[in-house]
């Protein structure tokens, strides 16, 4: 299953969470499911949910999320310790399905592409 992460230390938390949730909605609409294993309190994981229905967790101290001044989301597309999922993630069809869903989620939260770069609408 997939996981999405945002940091409460990111100054753009509301936008980060909105985009992460939109990506989660799109991934679920594509037939993919979030994994709950990051919320389990084993092996020091125990991450709190930000949006359980859409697979979004808080990961406050992850450097790439907390130090950016822009909205930030980290996607874990699957769990490779699950051998079946690892094999599926290696297929072009699964990668395309994931990429299309992420693109739809980004579009839903107002990220557009143009001129070779992505930007938030309204910024």
Please tell me what each predicted stretch does:
Residues 1-123:
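Active-site-proximal helix/loop segments of hydrolytic enzymes
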């Amino acid at each position: 299953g997939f996981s999405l992460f945002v940091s409460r230390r990111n100054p753009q938390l509301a936008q980060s969470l909105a985009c992460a949730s939109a990506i989660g909605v799109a991934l679920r609409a594509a037939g993919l499911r979030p994994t709950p294993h990051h919320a389990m309190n084993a092996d020091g994981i125990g991450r709190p949910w930000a949006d359980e229905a859409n697979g979004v967790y808080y990961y406050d101290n992850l450097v790439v999320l907390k130090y950016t001044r822009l909205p930030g989301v980290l996607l874990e597309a699957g769990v490779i310790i699950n051998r079946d999922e690892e094999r599926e993630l290696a297929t072009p069809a699964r990668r395309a399905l994931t990429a299309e869903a992420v693109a739809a989620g980004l579009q839903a939260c107002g990220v557009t592409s143009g001129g070779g770069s992505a930007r938030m609408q309204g910024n």
